[in-house]
Design a protein with these regions (language model features):
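Hydrophobic/aromatic beta-strand patches that form the interior of the parallel beta-sheet core
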Residues: 47, 127-129, 215
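A short acidic (Asp/Glu
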Residues: 58-60, 112-116, 138-143
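Iron-sulfur-cluster electron-transfer modules
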Residues: 1-105, 252-325
């Protein structure tokens, strides 16, 4: 079905929230907060993933107020369940004539919603944003990990993968169980080791700067090297604008941002060029997981070897770089 959405040559911006409190409470530069604020304050809807503390899954939900939106903020290193959200989104738009919707998800999820919206004739009423993605581990892996943490430490009531207490470039990942912080850096290390991702993630067709969503957002990594005079230690977001609608949307949120025009050379990062490479340990990891369970693989693949710990300590004493993962 014909729409008014037109692809344009991708435009690139670096940006972050002007509001320092909101910036500090965002996992990056506050791109999602700026975008969702614009929709919610005008009585429109947002669709995004929210963590469910009862069953330890991440699920897409319809968001209609800022309190609910707060639960959708932050990085989630697991696959989100779409459930019936496409039908719910369509029904909401049919029941709210003249209203608009923001959909935010990974590349595969957002492109799926784009195709659905075109098929249903609602593409002109939705703005579709995807997030730069490293890949998604199996939901079962995180669920078993969370259940293991709860058995040892008590009920999980809070989760963050990117707390910025040590700055944006050195995020802290932890859960709160019985009110106490519990590090989950072993899970994060497994995530970045590339051995636990879904098979399709290693062949992701969305790992490119040219996409068919309206906008792509993510961390503007290496900005301290490519645009040093714009770098902020509290977070920097990357905006890739792909359509005329994305351009229009970015103009609407500019008043909430400090921003700078950039280019695809300055913003280069691996997952804007190619999918994450499969780890040589992947088959071994899953065999160990099936035979020996979650605690074993987290200890084997999620811990830092003693030799590396000693090296890092020496580097720190000498003022050198620190191996973070």
């Amino acid at each position: 079905m014909k729409t008014n959405v037109e692809l344009i040559s991708t435009r690139v911006y670096a940006g972050r929230l002007k509001d320092r409190e909101n910036l500090n409470n965002s996992s990056s530069g506050g791109a999602f907060t700026a975008l969702s604020d614009f929709f919610l304050k005008n009585g429109n809807a947002v669709v995004a993933a929210i963590y469910n503390y009862e069953n330890h899954t991440t699920e897409f939900q319809m968001i209609l107020d800022k309190d609910q939106r707060e639960r959708a903020k932050g990085s989630k290193y697991m696959q989100s369940k779409p459930g019936c959200i496409f039908r719910e989104a369509y029904r909401w738009l049919m029941e709210h004539s003249g209203k608009k919707m923001l959909f935010v998800g990974m590349g595969c999820q957002s492109d799926g919603f784009r195709k659905f919206s075109e098929m249903k004739g609602i593409r002109d009423r939705v703005y579709i944003v995807d997030i730069i993605c490293h890949g998604s581990p199996s939901p079962k892996l995180w669920r078993e990990y969370a259940e293991s943490v709860q058995k040892k430490d008590g009920k999980i009531t809070f989760l963050t993968f990117k707390d910025k207490r040590n700055g944006w470039k050195s995020p802290t990942a932890y859960v709160k169980a019985n009110g106490e912080e519990k590090s989950i850096k072993d899970y994060v290390k497994v995530f970045y080791n590339r051995c636990a991702l879904r098979p399709s993630c290693y062949e992701c067709p969305y790992a490119t700067t040219e996409r068919r969503t309206d906008m792509t957002i993510g961390d503007f990594w290496h900005i301290e090297e490519t645009i040093p005079d714009f770098y902020d230690s509290n977070g920097n977001s990357l905006f890739l604008i792909h359509t005329n609608r994305g351009e229009e949307l970015f103009e609407k949120i500019q008043s909430d941002l400090d921003y700078r025009l950039s280019n695809t050379t300055q913003c280069w990062q691996a997952n804007l060029e190619a999918p994450t490479k499969k780890s040589e340990q992947r088959e071994e990891f899953w065999n160990d997981y099936k035979k020996k369970g979650i605690d074993f693989v987290m200890k084997k693949y999620g811990s830092v070897p003693m030799k590396t710990k000693i090296k890092n300590k020496l580097l720190k004493i000498m003022g050198g770089g620190v191996h973070r993962r």
